[in-house]
């Protein structure tokens, strides 16, 4: 499972990232990886975001910020999550994690897939 923390729905970088996950969803599935984007947005906001942008992955709401705090991604001063990626294996062990220096940047999908291949080797 790939947890992909993202700051907020309807922002330019987050929209581009969710669309990229949608475009490459089959590549993740072929690697037996479930992509789980997660943000502090409410469920209704994420549903609207998914419909408006034709996003093909289900997004998780961390509206109470509990998961973001546990994974250390919450930017307390902004009250939203930094962009981060956490790869969890079938046993629930975190195999890899990466947090961006700033929420305005993101890993390219090719980089994430390369990391998956490295871990699978």
What are these regions (language model features)?
Residues 1-121:
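Chalcogenol-based redox active-site neighborhoods
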């Amino acid at each position: 499972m790939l947890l992909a923390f993202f700051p907020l729905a309807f922002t330019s970088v987050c929209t581009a990232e969710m669309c990229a996950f949608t475009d490459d969803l089959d590549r993740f599935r072929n690697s037996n990886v479930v992509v789980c984007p997660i943000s502090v947005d409410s469920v209704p906001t994420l549903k609207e975001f998914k419909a408006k942008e034709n996003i093909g992955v289900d997004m998780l709401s961390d509206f109470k910020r509990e998961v973001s705090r546990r994974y250390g991604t919450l930017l307390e001063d902004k009250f939203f999550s930094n962009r981060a990626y956490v790869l969890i294996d079938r046993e629930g062990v975190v195999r890899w994690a990466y947090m961006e220096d700033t929420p305005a940047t993101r890993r390219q999908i090719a980089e994430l897939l390369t990391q998956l291949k490295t871990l699978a080797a």
